[in-house]
């Protein structure tokens, strides 16, 4: 097997500075512009998060750090490698390229968006910002332990990774309310970014802006939703309670009896796979070098240079960059360990089915409004006229991509019960691994080394949050690459 070494670091020519937009609606997350506004916006809050990080204050709004110790450093990064070609990696590459960096996107598959970003539920859902770190989650997990068709399934076989993750999950329960509020803020910011990028690049992704309807079959679930709505409102999201009669008016095709619901008109749905692939093409138009079929074997950094060993069509090669951004989903934990950091993402499997609506009767009987059934934890999206996506469940079973019939069957049964006029003759099953942090907050920020960054761990909200965290990461890297010295907290490496 051949081994080749290649440098992707530009020469000694003057560094190309990060691009700054004159119009704040063109380039979101710019701290100075947002501070000029008399009324704080969500983007200003994200910018304030970045300001707090540069001053060594505790991180907020999803930017995670493990230490408040400071390191004064000055760096002029020109070339950056982004590891991972899913929605998070591609949006990150796009945000960095817009700021003038020389970006290489490294993806082990032949195309972008072939794993977790392939066939998710499709919801761009600020209304789903509630984190899972609630005591009821543990109760349900124990109750459903022996049910193979349960919405939440935990393999009881122990592993240190699983035990440490759940220990940190339990430790995060006191921050449930605060993290839910901050996730709602991030989600609202993200959709503004994403819509603007889609319009700027002419991306068509079966986007449907008809809101998301949460349905509840009993009083207990509905009353809990009312408490969640107050947290979402604190994060800036408006949604309204609806009666069973209003549920029928919002989505007439839905069968069954329901206690009540909550409707979020500002939420929407779309095809994550199509969006990610088209944005990857937009990245290439901006000069991003998208290298597919490249499996990252190892990565290391000395603080000023990052070296990445790859296995691809040309054999084993080594490439060097000024910096690296890890957006590798469930693979981020292993890469972080090589870089001296701890990113405790756990793979939580979710399933989906795509129902092909082959006849006019099925197309009429399928819903157009996106749904979330609280009892079954299933979500839906109508993708164009001829596809109906149903997704959900959470399975803690390690790195396991098997598509199990006993996990797919409840999704098909749910369609037949709630939409009896939809033919399930042609159904495409799928399973993907969500990269989840124990506190349900994405890892966005610096690593131990000055030129190492992370944007990963978005869990079930990767599609929803990706554009905001990518833009925030772009701001952080741009600040690091500025000619003047800046003060940034160094993320302490955990044992």
Regions found by a protein language model. Name each.
Residues 78-105:
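N-terminal Rossmann-like FAD-binding beta1-loop-alpha1 element of flavoenzymes
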Residues 98-118:
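Glycine-rich FAD pyrophosphate-binding loop
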Residues 119-243:
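Dinucleotide-binding Rossmann-like beta1-alpha1 core, especially the glycine-rich loop
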Residues 120-123, 128, 132-170, 298-305, ...:
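Active-site substrate-recognition segment that forms the wall
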Residues 178-188, 214-224, 249, 262-281, ...:
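Short beta-strand to alpha-helix junction loop
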Residues 223, 227-235, 257-315:
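Helical element adjacent to the flavin cofactor pocket in flavoenzyme catalytic cores
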Residues 375, 417-495:
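C-terminal catalytic lobe of FAD-dependent flavoproteins
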